[in-house]
Amino acid sequence: MWSSSQASTRGVIEVGRVEAGPSHFPKRPAPRNSSRVNLSRTYAIKSCSVSSRTGLCLGQCYHKKSSACKCKLGWSSQPLSSLRHHLRVHSSASEAVLTSQSDFTKLLVGNEKIGVLLLNLGGPETLDDVQPFLFNLFADPDIIRLPRLFRFLQKPLAQFISVVRAPKSKEGYASIGGGSPLRQITDAQAEALRKALCDKDIPAKVYVGMRYWHPFTEEAIEQIKRDGITKLVVLPLYPQFSISTSGSSLRLLEGIFREDEYLVNMQHTVIPSWYQREGYIKAMATLIEKELRTFSEPQKVMIFFSAHGVPLAYVEEAGDPYKAEMEECVDLIMEELEKRGITNSCTLAYQSRVGPVEWLRPYTDETIIELGQKGVKSLLAVPISFVSEHIETLEEIDVEYKELALESGIKHWGRVPALGCEPTFITDLADAVIESLPYVGAMAVSNLEARQPLVPLGSVEELLAAYDSKRDELPPPVTVWEWGWTKSAETWNGRAAMLAVLALLVLEVTTGEGFLHQWGILPLFH
């Protein structure tokens, strides 16, 4: 699925029809004269419009060689917020022109019951929740991608990894109070969003669906059905799209929607990413500006954006737009800071990698050490991919990376808080929901050259079909082993280690004996 964030209020959008055509790459806006410090290789990022067999035009491609389609569009010269002055209500007796915000919102709502589903990762609320939470995480095929032949081992492998990793993870959660605050913060965001929508005359109900812990997405969907929601806006709380975050949650939703008659008939739309929205960018810039003032010499502070990493294969092989969206997001935030007279240097790195496979570089820990060696004395960490505080901000950044920075010679450390319920941010989410309502159950396209992507993005099924079809078109790896493994797959899985683990598991299952049975792991699956 290609991600496209919705247009901001200055966006240029119009319902359109997408037709396949010759390869065409719209010109990407010239990059700003950035002072970002690049500690790794330079990247060539291309934007293209991608057409799928569903007819839905979706956002940015990030790979070296790709074919694209050409969208025949009729562009509107007006932002969505001004459309209310031109919408008309037709009746048998008269035709009335909408001239007020109240009229516009009444048209949007009508007799519909509107719901907003916020999607997030979830987190263990107690130490006893840690191991089952990790099991749910690693049992997700979008997190650990096994070769098709061995996918039946997904859950046994997830059980093994979760048991092995649980003790260390419990130590981390114990250090931040015994559990993740993610649910509490997300519930607060949902309530704040509900109030913001109400203030804008949109009486919507807001639901929270977590991917790996309570309240699970399935629980939220059941409540949506009980409440009789007729129009649903699906809003992942991840600013940038990735296969492993928004993609995983949307794939789960696809299965739920496909199997439920009520949901099949319920109109819905999805906002897969929203990192370009003006309100979000301004909220991030405001938090950074505020934290810079806490330093004795703000102008000498390096702004250090730390994003959650993903395996490199997701970007290079599966076409994940996460890296391209993250880099553009950093540019947009720095552009906003420059408008405020803040011209500090910045850099971007990726944290939270696990396992022996290659992840997106540069790595946060290695970058901190390198910055210390280069003489950086003041560092302000910005958790750019997180909108809520949780273990990766409270423990990994605040404790581990802070200690590493001080040991590396960086004397002054600061950290920008996650957005949480920051008013500008919440208001912007409310605007995003309102802007998507006219397109629930429809398709729309946007001007990629103006960096104003799609506002409603279509149904879950359409989005995933579009992503999957594009992924199938990616060029195959250069080298394929004679037994069907690519070199990248060998790197990804660690062929020798993988085969050894599989052999042990097969022996355990067939003989009923071994260390996994002694530890009480495999009997859980009998």
UniProtKB/Swiss-Prot annotation:
Describe its function: Catalyzes the ferrous insertion into protoporphyrin IX.
Q: MF terms per GO, please?
A: ferrochelatase activity
Gene from which this protein is expressed: HEMH
Known InterPro entries for this protein?
Answer: Ferrochelatase, Ferrochelatase_AS, Ferrochelatase_C, Ferrochelatase_N
What the record says about family reads:
Belongs to the ferrochelatase family.
| EC number(s) recorded for this UniProt protein | 4.98.1.1
Keywords for this entry? Chloroplast, Heme biosynthesis, Iron, Lyase, Plastid, Porphyrin biosynthesis, Transit peptide
Subcellular location(s) of the protein: Plastid, Chloroplast
Q: Which organism is it from?
A: Oryza sativa subsp. indica
Keyword presence, Iron: yes
What name goes with this protein? Ferrochelatase-2, chloroplastic
List, alphabetically, the GO terms of the cellular component aspect.
Answer: chloroplast; mitochondrion
List the catalysed reactions: heme b + 2 H(+) = protoporphyrin IX + Fe(2+)
Gene Ontology biological-process annotations: heme biosynthetic process
Q: In which pathway does it act?
A: Porphyrin-containing compound metabolism; protoheme biosynthesis; protoheme from protoporphyrin-IX: step 1/1
